[in-house]
Amino acid sequence: MGKLRHIAMQVPDPAKAAEFYMRVFGMKKVGETDWENARGVYLSDGVINLALLNYKTVDAAGAERGVDYVGIHHLGFWVDDLAQTREAIEAQGGRYWMGEAVAGGGFYEVKYCDPNGVVVDITENGWGGAVKNVVAFDPKVEA
């Protein structure tokens, strides 16, 4: 079975977006790109690769989205401390959108919007079928 390990988002300013995800969720910068189709920053939490891209042409972005399109629908982070993460999101320019954690450990998440308006779920309880901690393939990478 395939495992989700890469998410790409179209953002207006990849470096600024990268700062948000690095400061709030502790993601690490693993690469950059700047070529004829796009410029971008690549981040990872040790399991998932997140590409923050700004496409330069309609052909590269896809005609159905165009160069002004921003985002995917949402992505989710399984966090250790919900209250601390909420504070960090707001301190970095994110805003609360909807939802609250379910008492007693239900799976529902709290939804925020990052500074670009992309929906970010946060939860201490995880999602069905998801594994919070994994063993890193590369021992130099913290999982």
Located regions from the model:
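N-terminal beta-strand motif that seeds the catalytic metal site of vicinal oxygen chelate
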Residues: M1-K16, I72-F77, G126-A143
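Vicinal oxygen chelate
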Residues: K3-P12, V41-S44, A63-A143, ...
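Short, charged/polar surface micro-motifs in flexible loops or helix N-caps
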Residues: G46-L50, T57-D59, L82-Q84
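Conserved beta-strand in the GNAT
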Residues: A51-L53, D121
